[in-house]
Amino acid sequence: MPTSPGLTEEQRSDLMRRLATSAYKRGNFTLASGRQSEHYVNCKPVSLSGTGLLLISTAMLSHVEDQSVAVAGLTLGADPLVSGVAVAGSLAHRDLDALIVRKAAKGHGTGAWLEGPLPQPGALITVLEDVVTTGGSSLKAVNQLREAGYVVNRVITIVDREEGGAAAMDAAELELISLFRLSEISAFAAELNQ
């Protein structure tokens, strides 16, 4: 099992265990994409816990492009991720801002799609995601950022469900980096339940 840069093998195993026990469920589920699945992954119980967010943020930070000035993601799943990675960056003496992409423009005031300290147009931003299935949520965030004049080349996700998201990212000229694949987490969960 390869080690995610930024995490020791022990830390990676700890994060995998947390995801397998607190984020992963097996049953019959309807996903955000509308697809039916026997696997469900909700990373919020892990990303909203102190140690879980620290592990995720450390791993994600190691994949953020060196020239990136900010991390961004679609609310709600990416909210703790962008904050956690920005803080991890600061602790590592790396200045990164956090941006939240709304699902719809703000209905009052400025009508903003983006929240946070906005960098200059043309700046490189890395998109963070909790779970990628078809890539729709990530692409919505990427499209809003690109329309605002930012450059986005990479999406980092905690879990790739391996259901077409990587191909969708590739078609949008994006590199998808996943900390874990669903097949890894489901196999680990099965081992724990034996």
From Swiss-Prot:
Residues at which 5-phospho-alpha-D-ribose 1-diphosphate binds: R102, K103, K106, H108, E129, D130, V131, V132, T133, T134, G135, G136, S137
Record keyword Manganese present: no
Its EC number(s): 2.4.2.10
GO biological process, one term: 'de novo' UMP biosynthetic process
Domain of life: Bacteria
Subunit and interaction comment: Homodimer.
Protein name: Orotate phosphoribosyltransferase
Annotated organism of origin: Synechococcus sp. (strain CC9902)
